[in-house]
């Protein structure tokens, strides 16, 4: 059974994070997988490996410490975030395979618009040249994933300048708008979720 796709619109980060934890903690072997498509109001999230020194200055944006892997990143309007609540044991997918599938979904989406993107060893996410266009972070609990991937579409990128994105000082961050791709965050979410479903179907095939 393919995951149930839920379009939650623009929602605050903290209750969404709590809902992911609650869903994962309460799911059973029969619980259908879900994919949530969201946007968030401005928020920084600090992963388990996050170091306070990667937050360079206070710009009045709230910071939430969370349990995904990785360092600090920014979410805001005009960026699509897709959360993958998957039973990896049931799907027979390893964590590394899921990361690769997520990255490939973004790469395939951008390729449809003539953009050549790539992954990097040891630095999860998707890059165009030297700049990062998508970030990902996951948590696995009892063989089930939550958290997911964010793709910069048409947003104010300036809050990234107040952090070392994903722990990398001076990392340039870009968005699809920079390539004159006529996408809204909503449209990008719809298209990216379809690529994710295709990748998961291939992995599970």
From Swiss-Prot:
Coiled-coil residue spans: none
Biological process terms in GO annotation: protein modification process
EC numbers, comma separated: 2.3.1.181
Top enzyme class: transferase
Binding sites annotated in the UniProt record for substrate: 68-75, 135-137, 148-150
Pfam annotation, one family: LplA-B_cat
Active site per the UniProt annotation: 166 (acyl-thioester intermediate)
Subcellular localization(s) per the UniProt record: Cytoplasm
Record keywords: Acyltransferase, Cytoplasm, Transferase
Limits of the BPL/LPL catalytic domain: 29-204
Pathway(s) of this molecule: Protein modification; protein lipoylation via endogenous pathway; protein N(6)-(lipoyl)lysine from octanoyl-[acyl-carrier-protein]: step 1/2
Annotated site residue numbers, Lowers pKa of active site Cys: 132
Catalytic activities: octanoyl-[ACP] + L-lysyl-[protein] = N(6)-octanoyl-L-lysyl-[protein] + holo-[ACP] + H(+)
GO cellular component, one term: cytoplasm
Miscellaneous comment text of the record: In the reaction, the free carboxyl group of octanoic acid is attached via an amide linkage to the epsilon-amino group of a specific lysine residue of lipoyl domains of lipoate-dependent enzymes.
Family: Belongs to the LipB family.
NCBIfam families according to UniProt: lipB, PRK14342.1, PRK14343.1
Matches recorded under PANTHER family: LIPOYLTRANSFERASE 2, MITOCHONDRIAL-RELATED (PTHR10993:SF7), OCTANOYLTRANSFERASE (PTHR10993)
Function noted in UniProt: Catalyzes the transfer of endogenously produced octanoic acid from octanoyl-acyl-carrier-protein onto the lipoyl domains of lipoate-dependent enzymes. Lipoyl-ACP can also act as a substrate although octanoyl-ACP is likely to be the physiological substrate.
Protein's name according to its UniProt entry: Octanoyltransferase
Organism of this sequence: Dechloromonas aromatica (strain RCB)
Encoding gene, per UniProt annotation: lipB
